[in-house]
Regions:
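Bacterial N-terminal signal peptides that target proteins for export
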Residues: 1-12
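Sec/Tat signal peptide C-region and signal peptidase I cleavage site
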Residues: 22-27
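C-terminal partner/receptor-binding element of secreted or periplasmic proteins
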Residues: 28, 103-129
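Asparagine-centered strand-capping/turn motif at beta-strand->loop junctions
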Residues: 54-62, 99-103, 114
Length: 129
């Protein structure tokens, strides 16, 4: 009977560890030396299950506008990151982060860290409106 009790305890502990590991697998960290060409917007996320946070520094020569866009909604400006300035913006589940280069001539450069639900973040570029 002692063997069965230990086996059952091992199974329960294993199941508990597995159930706590699944949410942890969704959390992650991405570091990026991001470049955004003149007249372009970097689009991050949209449709993901959890939220994420973007932190970092604008180490380029031009300002970058940070916006958030919930699914089916208009983009909402969160602020502008001047050259040498920092960004710390949190985006909710399903929300997209938009980082817009304000220049039509120069490339924007940022050093970013993205934390939170990074497992399914899409990344693409689009032309500025």
């Amino acid at each position: 009977m002692l063997f069965k009790a230990r086996t059952m305890t091992s199974i329960l502990v294993g199941a508990l560890l597995l159930s706590t590991a699944v949410p942890a697998a969704q959390a992650g960290e991405i570091t990026s030396g991001l470049q955004i060409e003149a007249g372009q917007t970097f689009e991050l996320g949209g449709g993901q299950e959890g939220g994420f946070t973007v932190t970092g520094k604008n180490n380029g020569p031009v300002a970058v506008v940070v916006l958030g866009q919930a699914e089916g909604k208009a983009a909402v400006e969160r602020g502008t990151v001047a050259p040498g300035g920092t960004v710390d913006a949190t985006f909710g589940p399903g929300e997209m982060a938009l980082l817009r280069n304000t220049s039509r001539q120069k490339t924007a450069r940022l050093k970013l860290k993205i934390t939170g639900d990074t497992s399914s973040l899409g990344m693409t570029y689009s032309g500025n409106p």
